[in-house]
Amino acid sequence: MVTMKDLLECGVHFGHQTRRWNPKMKKFIFGVRKNIYIIDLQKTLRYFRYTYNVVRDRAAEGQTMIFVGTKKQASETIKKAAISCGMPYVNHRWLGGMLTNFGTIKKSIRKLEIIKKMREEGQLDLLTKKEALMLTRKEEKLELYLGGIKEMNKLPDMMFVLDAVKEKIAIQEARRLGITVVAPLDTNCDPDVVDLPIPGNDDAIRSIHLFCNEMAAAMNEGKAALADETGVEVEPISAEEKEELIAEAVAEGEEFNFAEEGENA
């Protein structure tokens, strides 16, 4: 579990400049140094350990957590942390309705599944060059935005968010659905929108690594305590689904309006 030394070495105590802050974070601020807010690491350590234990215990009950972080310095770390504990993730762009309109999102995930299956079976080689090209482009875009949640068969129980300000839409959707929000809180964040806050820097690379890796470790520790595992039934792909998808990809051409479809459905 995280130590005070870890927090100091990763620069978790460095907040934003004093002109960029949320007054609600005052209780987590230790002081100011060269116009930079310094976060109280005693409180960070206490909140960090409490949150770790809660996440671990919920994972031991079979609960799941989606990892969300789309800013450049967090994207790859979010992906690696989520994969290391077998959890879903979004690390490029949060599409409106990803949770609140999950039914539509699942239809798009189904399309990705069909294209991949066709590729594995060599069926793309039997199509015209145009059809194969359009399906390949569609697959790439679906994979970019939905690759991290393609095995998410139900809504998650928890959401770990890296940068609560940037990912406010994801947090709003989670709160609307009663999904527990876990997030580090920098000095510009609103603690009222997070269920399990951990005051700390959410911009520095080493700090980001620490938060992500600890949450993944908590999930893995909890999952290890599970006695039983359940299998997932694979839905067969029909010929009609394949034909419809080929026609759809060709009709779309280079345009991919799945985001609007998810938001407006």
UniProtKB/Swiss-Prot annotation:
The disulfides recorded in the entry are none
InterPro entries according to UniProt: Ribosomal_uS2 (IPR001865), Ribosomal_uS2_bac/mit/plastid (IPR005706), Ribosomal_uS2_CS (IPR018130), Ribosomal_uS2_flav_dom_sf (IPR023591)
Gene3D superfamilies cross-referenced by the UniProt entry: Glucose-6-phosphate isomerase like protein, domain 1, Helix hairpin bin
SUPFAM superfamilies (UniProt xref): Ribosomal protein S2 (SSF52313)
List the Pfam families. Answer: Ribosomal_S2 (PF00318)
List GO terms (cellular component aspect).
Answer: cytosolic small ribosomal subunit
Classification via PROSITE patterns: RIBOSOMAL_S2_1 (PS00962)
**What GO molecular function terms would the record report?**
structural constituent of ribosome
Asked if the keyword Disulfide bond belongs to this entry, the reply reads no
List the PANTHER family.
Answer: 30S RIBOSOMAL PROTEIN S2 PROKARYOTIC AND ORGANELLAR, SMALL RIBOSOMAL SUBUNIT PROTEIN US2M
Q: Which family does it belong to?
A: Belongs to the universal ribosomal protein uS2 family.
Q: What is the protein name given in its UniProt record?
A: Small ribosomal subunit protein uS2
| Species annotation | Aliarcobacter butzleri (strain RM4018) (Arcobacter butzleri)
Provide the gene name from the record: rpsB
